[in-house]
Swiss-Prot record:
The protein's name in its UniProt record: ATP-dependent Clp protease ATP-binding subunit ClpX
Originating organism: Bacillus licheniformis (strain ATCC 14580 / DSM 13 / JCM 2505 / CCUG 7422 / NBRC 12200 / NCIMB 9375 / NCTC 10341 / NRRL NRS-1264 / Gibson 46)
SUPFAM superfamilies hit by this protein: Glucocorticoid receptor-like (DNA-binding domain), P-loop containing nucleoside triphosphate hydrolases
Phylogenetic classification of the source organism: Bacteria, Bacillati, Bacillota, Bacilli, Bacillales
Assembly with partners or alone: Component of the ClpX-ClpP complex. Forms a hexameric ring that, in the presence of ATP, binds to fourteen ClpP subunits assembled into a disk-like structure with a central cavity, resembling the structure of eukaryotic proteasomes.
NCBIfam families for the chain: clpX (TIGR00382), PRK05342.1 (NF003745)
Listed GO MF terms: ATP binding; ATP hydrolysis activity; ATP-dependent protein folding chaperone; protein dimerization activity; unfolded protein binding; zinc ion binding
UniProt xrefs under HAMAP family: ClpX (MF_00175)
A GO CC term assigned to this protein in UniProt: HslUV protease complex
Keywords from the UniProt entry: ATP-binding, Chaperone, Metal-binding, Nucleotide-binding, Zinc
Positions of ATP binding: 117-124
Annotated function: ATP-dependent specificity component of the Clp protease. It directs the protease to specific substrates. Can perform chaperone functions in the absence of ClpP.
Binding site for Zn(2+): 13, 16, 35, 38
């Protein structure tokens, strides 16, 4: 309802009641008016509240034990890696809150490198950390990067992804986390520096150095090379946490050689031949990464090394069932929406884990295996209203037998039926 001054018929501010003659500006809305003074007051209140929220967001960083407990809810195993990441992340944001200096002591930045086989949980750990801390998060693939002047993605595009994840709030992006995957793929081809250009290897490492250490980078908001005349966004990377992950296939041989050289006397080879891959990865040192093909300056920017173990059968079964977002829970929920109870027998879960190990895909391959098993079930069951329960057996996984179906009248279908895939 419009507000008028009864004596003069003037419009009034709906908030403070001042007339249009008493204020400089009166802004009209549908049936309501607000003056310039009230707008200014509202702006101050909103800025104060948002400012205090931002402060809380980064000052109330969970303690390392709390971070690890939350990681345990989503990621199975990898205890040592979780501990390393929890401490590193806590110290990183503690450093930001102290403005990088405590009693004139400058706290240096600690980026992280994660070494572990495919499907061991590197990406999931990084994603979960960002979720715990409620900070912007971006994933980049090192294999798509090339140094400036060559066809491919510029290093600055990594920062653009983070800015986009922060809804173009640069200040928020400057406290985010960037996960660079497949970092082992930009290792140079040999330990010795090459005379020829290595477009996708050493050159990319050199290009990444500055943003890893901390610099003010100019980021093209539309992605760079196709729009040369655009305005650049300035972003300071000093407080961005970089996590670089890779499988580093073959690094265990480098570690083995190093350990073998340090054992004196007979049987030095035999002593280390029995070391499992996981045990070897836990003994990785910066010098091993250097021999693998990372340049010394790049290794220096990643002082914390967290090694992840290959997942065994037991861990894969737990991944299927225990985390909050476990695959079995997800599929069970999907069928529950069609009023069907889904049950995976223990033998079925074990066989799914075995298949993932055979394919050498780790946890990453579990979904595609289950998707193959569940395809016919999820195609047929929504059209049927007579089924109460669907049981996935070991034979369903190994031999492709149809799952056992329990009807609403108690009848069991496919109980003893044996068909090959």
């Amino acid at each position: 309802m419009f507000k008028f001054n009864e004596e003069k018929g003037q419009l009034k501010c709906s908030f403070c009641g001042k007339t249009q003659d008493q204020v400089r500006k009166l802004v009209a809305g549908p049936g309501v008016y607000i003056c310039d003074e009230c707008i200014e007051l509202c702006t101050e209140i909103v800025e104060e509240e948002l400012g205090s929220e931002e402060e809380v967001e980064f000052k109330d960083v969970p303690k390392p034990k709390e971070i690890r407990e939350i990681l345990d809810e989503y990621v199975i195993g990898q205890d040592q890696a979780k501990k390393s990441l929890a401490v590193a992340v806590y110290n990183h944001y503690k450093r930001i809150n102290s403005n990088s200096k405590v009693d004139d002591v400058e706290l240096s930045k600690s980026n992280i490198s994660m070494i572990g086989p495919t499907g061991s949980g590197k990406t999931l750990l990084a994603q979960t950390l960002a979720r715990i801390l409620n900070v912007p998060f971006a994933i980049a693939d090192a294999t798509s990067l090339t140094e400036a002047g060559y066809v491919g993605e510029d290093v600055e595009n990594i920062l653009l992804k983070l800015i986009q994840a922060a809804d173009y709030d640069v200040e928020k992006a400057e406290k985010g986390i960037i996960y660079i995957d497949e970092i082992d793929k930009v290792a140079r081809k040999s330990e010795n520096p090459s005379i020829t250009r290595d477009v996708s290897g050493e050159g990319v490492q050199q290009a990444l150095l500055k943003i890893l250490e901390g610099t003010v980078a100019s980021v093209p908001p539309q992605g760079g090379r196709k729009h040369p005349h655009q305005e650049f966004i300035q972003i300071d990377t000093t407080n961005i946490l970089f996590i670089c992950g890779g499988a580093f296939d073959g690094i265990e041989q480098i570690i083995k050689r190093r350990l073998g050289q340090k054992v004196i006397g007979f049987g030095s080879d035999n002593k280390h031949e029995d070391l499992e891959k996981e045990a070897l990865l836990s003994k990785v040192l910066p010098e091993d990464l250097l021999r693998f093909g990372l340049i010394p300056e790049f290794i220096g920017r990643l002082p914390i090394i967290a090694s992840l173990e290959p997942l065994d059968e037991k861990a894969l079964v737990e991944i299927l069932t225990k985390p909050k977002n476990a695959l079995v829970k997800q599929y069970r929920k999907m069928l529950e929406l069609d009023d069907v109870e889904l049950v995976f027998e223990d033998e079925a879960l074990t066989e799914i884990a075995k298949k993932a190990i055979e394919r050498k895909t780790g946890a990453r391959g579990l979904r595609s295996i289950i998707e193959g098993i569940m395809l016919d079930v999820m195609f047929d069951l929504p059209s049927r209203e007579d089924i109460e329960k669907c049981v996935i057996t070991g034979k369903t996984v190994t031999d492709g037998e149809p799952p056992r179906l329990i009807m609403k009248d108690g009848t069991v279908v496919n109980k003893d039926k044996k068909t090959s895939a």
